[in-house]
């Protein structure tokens, strides 16, 4: 195999194909994760009309299963992308997504909805969302935060348009027609996104880069072949050699070093994702119960996603200049403040203005968290791109388990206490714990100097 030069290890960092891939990733995330984040509208409809006999925590499992599958199968999906490229992996999942939503329009029972909207569509989104992020990350270096922010804003755009579209169509034409039209939009976005997305490196070139990156691990200079080492030095040299090679745990995690920051980062991802989707799923119900008109309550989800769309772009752009972990620590801290200092008081003294302010503010700061996840992973692995699929998959596994328990546990707290205050308090506490974990990771990587770019 021909050697790979240093310049070939560096991403192209722009060009027509790169920005076309950003657009394709935007469409894929609009139609996959963006549709899933419209869960609050479906939960409100199921609770009030279709499945009133089911509790909030039971209905929360529909979105929870979808989100868990999107990120929980990240390791095999990422490995497939590393081996075969983006399009061959994404294509069958696009077909599955269209079929699963078509079947959703025929569902009548809770378990039918769980299987179609939760399991089948969630699995389909797992094969579109992660590859869409990976291929964008491979194209950019210094502009990575901006590019990923623009691409990931697609999920917020989907979360903005689908709640309005679905709620209006349900009110005017019924559930089945609403699903038919939204399936058409999802299908067109997925197919166009599939055509536009393309990785910068063919699978064979990626394999060569992977081999080159592995050989680039720092090591001591080996003795010449014809020189026999002193027997008295054998014990010392072997111990030094062992210390310069990655530990097994670091190898499994795809890390050369930075193992402690990586673990702290994974804890932060779990805790923040535990809280992330709670307002997306429950805010419309809470707002309606607090006296907000149902039409306006449904739009709170669109407001969150409108704020999130801006929040995914601006923090990503700023992180290219100030550092990914600096901005990540800031936006997760602000997300905890939004939950504990804004939403919790507004719940006990509800006003339409307070609910709207929380929706926009929380959407903005939580959007920054979502868009910075992949740039932070790249920063943790020293900018290597050949194994990004596997590394993103490991991070997504932590995200998946956070999503798996977050919405149902929060819903169970609300069911047990009979009010929503415990749900909001638990979400805020977990978000604060996640922010602390990101701060620990940032300090371990860059020290205590707040001015250093990390």
Model-found features: residue ranges?
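Extracytoplasmic gate region of multi-pass secondary transporters
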Residues: 31, 35-46, 254-326, 370, ...
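Helix-loop-helix hairpin linking two adjacent transmembrane segments in secondary transporters
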Residues: 143, 150-206
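Conserved MFS/SLC helix-loop-helix module at the cytosolic interface between two early adjacent transmembrane helices
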Residues: 72-112, 319
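C-terminal ends and interior cores of transmembrane alpha-helices
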Residues: 95-108, 333-349
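Cytosolic juxtamembrane N-terminal segment immediately preceding the first transmembrane helix
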Residues: 1-35, 196-206, 230-263
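Intracellular juxtamembrane helix-capping segments at the cytosolic ends
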Residues: 46, 118, 125-148, 279, ...
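Hydrophobic core of transmembrane alpha-helices in multi-pass small-molecule transporters
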Residues: 26, 30, 97-101, 110-127, ...
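A late C-terminal transmembrane helix in Major Facilitator Superfamily
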Residues: 381-420, 426-427
